[in-house]
A protein has these predicted regions:
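Short, surface-exposed, charged amphipathic helix/loop patches that serve as local interaction elements
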Residues: 35-123
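N-terminal "first-domain core" detector
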Residues: 2-48
Length: 123
């Protein structure tokens, strides 16, 4: 059997951004997040939601979805906007942006992040 050389396959990570229109703004949403970025998203979510040895489910939900927006979209936020993440979350959630981002990420990709997070919480 002939061997195929990996380098000759010229592959790279396929994030395949999908463009959506949200309130007249074009937003790109990645369809695949590289594994290191998935790890970072899950770990930051867990670290920020841990209170006295217990994961606060409200904060876990908030940070998970905020970091989903930060990492899967091309939306940029200033440091000042990120200072009050609860307020930022409320603005994004109440205006439907988080729902739109979730709808436009492949279900398998979204579910895999939850699996990783739940598995790490059980350790």
């Amino acid at each position: 059997m002939a061997k195929t050389i990996y380098a000759s396959m010229k592959m790279k990570v396929q994030t395949n951004p999908k463009e959506i229109d949200f309130n007249g703004n074009k937003i790109e949403i990645l369809q695949y997040l590289p594994i290191e970025d998935k790890y970072d998203l899950v770990m930051v979510t867990l670290q920020k939601s841990l209170e006295d040895g217990v994961y606060n489910p409200i904060k876990k939900d908030m940070y998970f979805h905020l970091y989903l927006v930060y990492m899967y979209t091309d939306i940029t936020f200033t440091d000042k906007q990120k200072e009050d993440e609860s307020k930022l979350y409320d603005v994004l959630e109440s205006n439907g942006l988080i729902t739109e981002v979730i709808k436009n990420i492949p279900e398998e990709e979204y579910n895999k992040l939850f699996e990783y997070m739940n598995e790490l919480m059980d350790l």
